[in-house]
UniProtKB/Swiss-Prot annotation:
Record family assignment: Belongs to the EBP family.
E.C. designation(s): 5.3.3.-
Name of the protein in question: Isomeliandiol synthase MOI2
Tissue specificity comment: Expressed in maturing fruits and in juice vesicles.
Entry GO CC: endoplasmic reticulum; membrane
Main subcellular location of this protein, as a coarse class: membrane
Compartmental location: Membrane
Superkingdom per UniProt: Eukaryota
Catalytic activity: 7,8-epoxymelianol = isomeliandiol
PANTHER family tied to this protein: 3-BETA-HYDROXYSTEROID-DELTA(8),DELTA(7)-ISOMERASE, STEROL ISOMERASE
Length: 217
């Protein structure tokens, strides 16, 4: 059966179309994300450390980010033939839908496979560790967040650059190009960049304070 992806000559044997509508896929994604956000916000609000709102939002970011890497991207990484799924599996439906904006997920493009493999195995678990570090006020919190954000920013940069170098031909329509490839993909550039700036300032301030104390004593 023919597929909706670009380029049209992409070979996907036994392709099975989505059994769920686009709105249904987005609705389930939204519900799951909101539930995680709600739980983390409530838990962080009861922390004896009296976390700032920024730290609480960062905990949400790392929780959602980590779960996406481990669960959503983990499913894709270990399910090379998700596009054949006939059961209506939620995760298969998500990736069939997202592939309309970037068919490299359906074709298992080596660049995407490498980037997502690192995200699934390393970045996902480390993101949950970053959430824990913020909650407990661990000394490694800022350096861990900076390192993770740098990896996410670098991986997302490669994600976009490799697509551009190959002619930006992987979205089936301009709508999916901008809403999926650009908007959703760009999230992994914007938020990591903002977190890196914040962590950089905090780390530099801590180093200056340490230098000052060293000179005093």
């Amino acid at each position: 059966m023919s597929h909706p992806y670009s380029p049209s000559d992409l070979i996907l044997p036994d392709f099975t179309p989505n059994l769920r509508s686009t709105s249904e896929v987005h609705a389930w994604n939204g519900i799951a994300s909101f539930l995680v956000m709600f739980i983390i916000w409530r838990i962080s609000g009861r922390s004896p450390r009296k976390l700032s709102k920024t730290d609480r939002w960062l905990m949400i970011w790392w929780a959602v980010s980590g779960l996406i890497h481990i669960i959503h991207e983990g499913y894709w990484f270990f399910s090379p033939e998700f596009y054949k799924d006939k059961s209506g599996n939620y995760f298969a439906e998500v990736w069939k839908e997202y592939s309309k904006g970037d068919s490299r997920y359906a074709s298992r493009h080596v660049a995407v496979l490498a980037i997502e493999g690192i995200a699934v195995i390393f970045v996902g678990p480390a993101s949950l560790l970053a959430m824990y570090a913020i909650a407990k006020g661990k000394s490694y919190s800022y350096i861990l967040q900076f390192a993770l954000s740098l990896v996410q920013f670098y991986g997302s940069s490669l994600y976009f650059i490799t697509a551009f170098l190959e002619g930006n031909k992987f979205a089936c329509t301009r709508y999916f190009y901008y809403s999926y490839f650009i908007a959703q993909g760009g999230t992994w550039l914007l938020f990591p960049a903002l977190i890196m700036i914040r962590c950089w300032k905090r780390i530099c301030a801590a180093c200056l304070l340490l230098d000052h104390k060293t000179k005093v004593y």
